[in-house]
């Protein structure tokens, strides 16, 4: 037998191990390595948005008032996109445009690129946070995969689309009414509602809402009587080992309603994940197509017949005319720097005019 004499030397922790221990410590709010990206970026994005909507005008970029200081409210205030003349400049505060002048930087629209970039990295940090936590507690990473869908939409709308156009000017500004303006722009200039990728996105979001409502109602309807409490929540025991609701009863119910029903909880919940995530991914792909000015469905035969026959009109041809009206009215209002002037006879006229 061999006896080893001497004291065991404990390995010294390096800086990485020390940081890893602190960042991944079990605490009320988990930080993690992803938190190094998430928390600063989220702080700066929200701080920039609150600063912009409170104090900063859009007069120099859009000819608009956009702050509480100018009289806007929560629905009409916005952090607006930079001027079209600045194209795709990242508009750093220290860059050649603002040259370190914070007031000038705000006037040029620098807060928009600041909020957009920090917002995007904040969202990515939140997705990485879900990956990190899932790995720590040995869960599958489907939460993070699902969250990639809204990230894809954000990146495609706020970055890919304006990169395909002439500048950040054509991205959405960060505000409620500003987003509505952007939606109208998408419809008028891209016929977005007739785009098959938009249709898939709508089917995904509304389908997910329907699935959530059906699933929640079905679970509530088939709860086991596991207590004598006054309501569902008082009767529920968080440490129970048995099922909360009867999948068999739910399956029999929907089999009678539709003729088919989910017989497996895994497939049911995967479908509830698949529908909205795929819809949002498809919508993001469609916006990438719009960045390249790819067109939606064109039913040219109907347009030709409507042009030749005054008595022939479809909902499609009516929508095409409405899009032309949006473009004619909106271009001059939306792009004042172009000094667009349309002859009176080409502008659409409604009953109010």
From Swiss-Prot:
CDD domains hit by this protein: Photosystem-II_D2
Subcellular location: Plastid membrane
Keyword Membrane attached: yes
Annotated transmembrane regions: 41-61, 125-141, 153-166, 208-228, 279-295
Disulfide pairings: none
Residues involved in chlorophyll a ChlzD2 binding: 118
Main localization category: plastid
Catalysed reactions, as listed in the record: 2 a plastoquinone + 4 hnu + 2 H2O = 2 a plastoquinol + O2
The entry's keywords: Acetylation, Chlorophyll, Chromophore, Electron transport, Iron, Magnesium, Membrane, Metal-binding, Oxidoreductase, Phosphoprotein, Photosynthesis, Photosystem II, Plastid, Transmembrane, Transmembrane helix, Transport
Pfam families associated with the record: Photo_RC (PF00124)
Residues given in the record as a plastoquinone binding sites: 215, 262
Chain positions recorded as chlorophyll a PD2 binding sites: 198
Modification Phosphothreonine occurs at: 2
GO terms for biological process, alphabetical: photosynthetic electron transport in photosystem II
Residues found modified as N-acetylthreonine: 2
E.C. number: 1.10.3.9
Co-factor binding comment: The D1/D2 heterodimer binds P680, chlorophylls that are the primary electron donor of PSII, and subsequent electron acceptors. It shares a non-heme iron and each subunit binds pheophytin, quinone, additional chlorophylls, carotenoids and lipids. There is also a Cl(-1) ion associated with D1 and D2, which is required for oxygen evolution. The PSII complex binds additional chlorophylls, carotenoids and specific lipids.
Membrane topology, as annotated: Multi-pass membrane protein
Family: Belongs to the reaction center PufL/M/PsbA/D family.
Additional notes on this entry: 2 of the reaction center chlorophylls (ChlD1 and ChlD2) are entirely coordinated by water.
NCBIfam families named among the record's database cross-references: psbD
Quaternary structure and partners: PSII is composed of 1 copy each of membrane proteins PsbA, PsbB, PsbC, PsbD, PsbE, PsbF, PsbH, PsbI, PsbJ, PsbK, PsbL, PsbM, PsbT, PsbX, PsbY, PsbZ, Psb30/Ycf12, at least 3 peripheral proteins of the oxygen-evolving complex and a large number of cofactors. It forms dimeric complexes.
Name used for this protein in its record: Photosystem II D2 protein
Gene encoding the protein: psbD
């Amino acid at each position: 037998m061999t006896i080893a004499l001497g004291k065991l030397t404990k390995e010294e922790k390096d800086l990485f191990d020390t940081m890893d221990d602190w960042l991944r410590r079990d605490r009320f709010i988990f930080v993690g390595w992803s938190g190094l990206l998430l928390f600063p970026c989220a702080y700066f994005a929200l701080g920039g948005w609150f600063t912009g909507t409170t104090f900063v005008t859009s007069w120099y970029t859009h000819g608009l008032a956009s702050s509480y200081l100018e009289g806007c409210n929560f629905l009409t205030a916005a952090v607006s996109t930079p001027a079209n003349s600045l194209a795709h400049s990242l508009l750093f505060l220290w860059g050649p445009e603002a040259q370190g002048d914070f007031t000038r930087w705000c006037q040029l629209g620098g807060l928009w690129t600041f909020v957009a970039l920090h917002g995007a990295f904040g969202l990515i940090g939140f997705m990485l946070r879900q990956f990190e936590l899932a790995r720590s507690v040995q869960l599958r990473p489907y939460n993070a995969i699902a969250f990639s869908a809204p990230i894809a939409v954000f990146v495609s709308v706020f970055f890919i689309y304006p990169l395909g156009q002439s500048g950040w000017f054509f991205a959405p500004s960060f505000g409620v009414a500003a987003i509505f303006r952007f939606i109208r722009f998408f419809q008028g200039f891209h016929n977005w509602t007739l785009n098959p990728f938009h249709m898939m996105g709508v089917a995904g979001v509304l389908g997910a809402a329907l699935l959530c409502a059906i699933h929640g109602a079905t679970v509530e309807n088939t709860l086991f009587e596991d207590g004598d409490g006054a309501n569902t929540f008082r009767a529920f025991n968080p440490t129970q080992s048995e099922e909360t609701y009867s999948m068999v009863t739910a399956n029999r119910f929907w089999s009678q309603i539709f003729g088919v029903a989910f017989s497996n909880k895994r497939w049911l919940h995967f479908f509830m994940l698949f529908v909205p995530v795929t819809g949002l991914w498809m919508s993001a792909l469609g916006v990438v197509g719009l960045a390249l000015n790819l067109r939606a469905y064109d039913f040219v035969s109907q347009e030709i017949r409507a042009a030749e026959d005054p008595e022939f009109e479809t909902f499609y041809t009516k929508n095409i005319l409405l899009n032309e009206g949006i473009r004619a009215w909106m271009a001059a209002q939306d792009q004042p720097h172009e000094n667009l002037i349309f002859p009176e006879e080409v502008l659409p006229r409604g009953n109010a005019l």
